[in-house]
């Protein structure tokens, strides 16, 4: 076994996929601004958050298995 440090390719691929998900990120950021002052706790941006990460995960999944051994 080599002494090289193992690098997680998923983290690198996530960074490279973020530019493809700008629309979802902007929707999430707009939502967080809208609900910022909500004292009741009923408003949230869970849907937009998951939409953003779904976009990134979909992009990463197409490339990730090429990097795994």
From Swiss-Prot:
Cellular component GO terms held in the UniProt record: mitochondrial inner membrane; respiratory chain complex III
A Pfam family matched in the record: UCR_hinge
UniProt-listed SUPFAM superfamilies: Non-heme 11 kDa protein of cytochrome bc1 complex (Ubiquinol-cytochrome c reductase)
Top-rank lineage group of the source organism: Eukaryota
Membrane-related topology note: Peripheral membrane protein
Localization (cell): Mitochondrion inner membrane
Main location: mitochondrion
GO annotation, biological process: mitochondrial electron transport, ubiquinol to cytochrome c
Cysteines paired by S-S bonds: 17-59, 31-45
Keywords, ordered alphabetically: Disulfide bond, Electron transport, Membrane, Mitochondrion, Mitochondrion inner membrane, Respiratory chain, Transport
Function: Component of the ubiquinol-cytochrome c oxidoreductase, a multisubunit transmembrane complex that is part of the mitochondrial electron transport chain which drives oxidative phosphorylation.
Record-stated family: Belongs to the UQCRH/QCR6 family.
Alphabetized PANTHER family for the sequence: CYTOCHROME B-C1 COMPLEX SUBUNIT 6, MITOCHONDRIAL, UBIQUINOL-CYTOCHROME C REDUCTASE COMPLEX 7.8 KDA PROTEIN
Record's comment describing the protein's domains: Lacks the acidic domain of other UQCRH.
Subunit (UniProt): Component of the ubiquinol-cytochrome c oxidoreductase (cytochrome b-c1 complex, complex III, CIII), a multisubunit enzyme composed of 3 respiratory subunits cytochrome b, cytochrome c1 and Rieske protein, 2 core protein subunits, and additional low-molecular weight protein subunits. The complex exists as an obligatory dimer and forms supercomplexes (SCs) in the inner mitochondrial membrane with cytochrome c oxidase (complex IV, CIV).
The protein's name in its UniProt record: Cytochrome b-c1 complex subunit 6
């Amino acid at each position: 076994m080599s002494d090289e440090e193992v690098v997680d390719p998923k983290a690198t691929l996530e960074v490279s996929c973020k530019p493809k998900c700008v629309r979802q990120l902007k929707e999430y950021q707009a939502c967080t601004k809208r609900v910022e002052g909500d004292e009741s706790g009923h408003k949230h941006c869970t849907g937009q958050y998951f939409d953003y990460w779904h976009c990134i995960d979909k992009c990463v999944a197409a490339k990730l298995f090429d990097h795994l051994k």
